[in-house]
Amino acid sequence: MEISILFLPLAASIISGFFGKYIGDRNSELVTSILVSISAILSIFVLYQVIFNQYEENIVIATWINSGSLDVNWSMLIDPLSAVMLVVVTSVSSLVHIYSIGYMSHDPHKPRFMAYLSLFTFAMLMLVTSDNFLQLFFGWEGVGLCSYFLIGFWFKKESANTAAIKAFVVNRVGDFGFALGIFLIFYLFGTVNYDEVFQQVPSMTAAGVTPFLDKELVFLGINFRAVDLICLLLFIGAMGKSAQILLHTWLPDAMEGPTPVSALIHAATMVTAGVFLVVRCSPIYEYSEPVSYTHLRAHETRG
């Protein structure tokens, strides 16, 4: 059932994207809306199980990378946080799909639009159910790519093309910081799996253990504790996706896309990805003292 939640939107995207011209506009709309709605219903059932039966599971779908010390599976992590996000993403997406049937009724490219919506949903689900930072990053980039497709859907409008490129480029700035944060995590912890990373953080602060959290690293000429630098780099990624100050300029222009796109990206899905990242990494953020951010602001003021 859990795997169906993830792959139903992908199946909807493939059917509408590759076979839309054969099955027709109406069938493309129905297939995508129905499959995503089924995914939403199953997500609600999973959330019920998590809340009332304390259900938690890490479902391994496939072995992804096994090279040296890097061992990464494509997994589906079900816990309270991911269960809530499953409901948020699929319920909002299903409503947007249904609304799009009427809103896009006069558009000649309806199957392509519905395929993009479903693919965006799949990428977002891949993001929120990841059990490691690498899968999270791939879902993160998938969401960014789909947002580019959706914002620039009306490609004959120059303003839509400009807005799509702007959103894509600005988000890549944040994603670069996010990628550096993942590289640093692997360098310091030797793994990108959530459980292994989160378990090591407190153990490395125990008496008699090398004070990992006090290890000084230099980034852009500024000395950071290792954990503070990790949190800063991850937060830069969150700033891009959640359109926070300095990396927020893409958001107003993104309104150039069809209204359902604005609802899907801005209301409750893509912009929550940054918040999700910070919450998911809270076991690391717990060991990053707020004073480090005060020092950072002081350096910015001096600059």
Language model features with spans:
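...captures the hydrophobic TM-helix bundle architecture rather than a specific catalytic motif
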Residues: 1-297, 302
